[in-house]
Amino acid sequence: MKVKQQLKQLKPYQPGKPIEEVKREYQLETVIKLASNENPYGCSPLVRQAVMNELDDLALYPDGYSRTLREALAAHIGISEKQLIFGNGSDEVVQIICRAFLQKGTNTVMATPTFPQYRHNAIIEGAEVREIPLQDGHHHLEAMLEAIDDHTRVVWICSPNNPTGTYVNDASLRAFLNKVPQHVLVVVDEAYYEYVQAEDYPNTVSLLQQYENMMILRTFSKAYGLAALRIGYGIAHEHLLQAIEPAREPFNTSRLAQAAAFAALKDQTFIQQCAQKNKQGLDQFYAFCDEYGLRYYKSEGNFILIDFGFSGDEVFTYLLQRGIIVRSGCALGFPTAVRITVGSAEQNETIIRALTNMLKERRDSFCKETF
């Protein structure tokens, strides 16, 4: 048996260690996971009852059109119901786009480092991947434009970008879209949209009226706290979605996910509270970094990338031994950094305390070695 040649250059996704495994390995009673950009406050209390109401119908297929959720979400965003496509997480919408647009002989343009699933799915489809290094943590849009040619089919903009948390502002995005050829789809991935505080962040939905070659991705996994249920969506012109719908699997979002997302959407107070707490949490980390002279990017997401100036794996291991799970930057293209999900105020205090102790221990060790 022979699998696709391009699969041989890919590795399957490696999830972090489960909390229970970390407890056993390090003999810990409590473990804080701040590695996957999940919502530390969970989801809206409305979700639990919505899921419970679906349990008697688990033998029935879900609504393949997601009509109830579709109507509510379209009204919430202010668009037509036909401008939405749903996926088993926004990851699946990325997969659908790659399946629909990319093949051998085409290419796709993206930043690096960024969300890895753009590259992963493009390679599976046999497309050439053109990666443009970030410029001081931000998308280098001019260089991305220069990488586009007649064979380019999709350009990816992750804003806020994972793992840096930086964003593309309104003026920059408009200028970029004005120069992108009409045959190229521009995908703006807004997985962390609900956390954004920047005043010059673009109203991407309104831009769809002017740029028909644009698609927006959002998710219920982050601020809405439904990561376990896997549901995300794309927003675009009706004719674009009609063209790619055949690449979507039928019944790709479960009835539990649809019901949970519908309920979560009703509770915008919860979302606003989470966004405000996240802002306060980022301020905790900014203050810590400023005190110790650590480099970081101002983040519009629910995470922060901090450069410690030495191996991110070392920081990761130090914290793991103390019951705190973060993401080493070595796996993200930033070998001297770690990415930390913003937790509750108490969780943030715990990790900042641990990081402070780590820096003091390294300083004391350095002083002894140089004495």
Curated annotation (Swiss-Prot):
EC number of the protein: 2.6.1.9
Q: In which pathway does it act?
A: Amino-acid biosynthesis; L-histidine biosynthesis; L-histidine from 5-phospho-alpha-D-ribose 1-diphosphate: step 7/9
- Gene3D superfamilies (UniProt xref): Aspartate Aminotransferase, domain 1 (3.90.1150.10), Type I PLP-dependent aspartate aminotransferase-like (Major domain) (3.40.640.10)
The domain of life is Bacteria
In this UniProt entry, the residues modified to N6-(pyridoxal phosphate)lysine are K222
Q: Which cofactor does it need?
A: pyridoxal 5'-phosphate
Record bears the keyword Oxidoreductase: no
The yes or no answer to whether the keyword Membrane is present is no
Q: How does it assemble?
A: Homodimer.
Could you identify this protein by its name? Answer: Histidinol-phosphate aminotransferase
State the gene name recorded for this protein: hisC
